[in-house]
Amino acid sequence: AEKQPNGEMRDIQTQSIAIGDGLNYEKPACNPVLTQKDLPEGFSKFDFRDPKIWREADGTYSVVTVCLAEDGSGAAALFQSKDGFDWHFVTVLERCNNQYGKMWECPDFFPLDGKQVLMLGPMEMLPKGEFHNGHNVIAFIGSYDEATHTFTKENVQLMDGGIDFYATQTTLAPDGRRIMTAWLQTWSDTEDKPQGCKWFGQTICPRELHIKDGRILQTPVRELDAVHGKRTFHENVTVQGETSLEGIKGRVADLTVTVQPGEYRSFTLKLAADADHHTSLTYDPYTSQLTLDRSYAGSRADIVHRRSCKVRSQNGALKLRILLDKNSIEVFANDGEQTMTAWIYTP
């Protein structure tokens, strides 16, 4: 920590390494291996964190970190090392330029289906388009020239339009799939643990990532299919008023629903519902808005409980897959073109 002129103590952020076998680790004397002196001039020593490291095909190592640039907003910096101990600065992959929030967090940088993705979590965003206030997770999709270490973004997308989704990280499965996890919570509700709850917070069901038409698609990992229990099917159901379907009940379910075009103003699914509680998912075919609302899920906290995102409808048709767990809901629209995620602490 460093004492400021006003007497405040501020932590200095540096990067260090530890060597171990998965259980026991030792910190070498060369730590820290990256400090402010390794950053471009004007970058902050107080905001330099969240390293994501990977091994390149030639055996060298790369790491992407986030830092605060001289303009007071985030940047993603790339470093490389031959041995994992001696690191050098390579380039700034992307700058916020005060367009996407302020400081950035939890960066990731990886190839996907012929494109290159820089994924990270902006803090303090203002609402614009599909982005909402506060913490978001966004992906810059583009190309990467390895010879010049130049990342060129082509598209920018929000990774989840729900309420609780942050701090994404990916890994490469042995079969080549890019698998993503995330914190199924957000900083704004970390102090609102339900009374009597012995734990708080979780991660999402791991998701496979692919790119189609310049956009990242997210689907639950295929391993989930192997653990399904009883399957129930309903076809060509005409819904009038409030309708319950036989065999569709419980707090743990993997639901696939296809909403067909029709003369209706809105369509609502009530999930984790009893006489006093429910979480609703409402589709408005006229505006193509999908709204997740947990206002009646049982939380007493004064936090965000409702959020909407625009989905692509085909003349009013919409396909939904919903992972309902005891304390969470994950929604995948149109085979993962959009997702919406939220925790629920329904009794």
What do these predicted ranges mean?
Residues 138, 143-164, 169-347:
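Beta-rich accessory regions
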Residues 49-52, 105-108, 166-169:
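Beta-propeller and closely related beta-sheet repeat lectin domains
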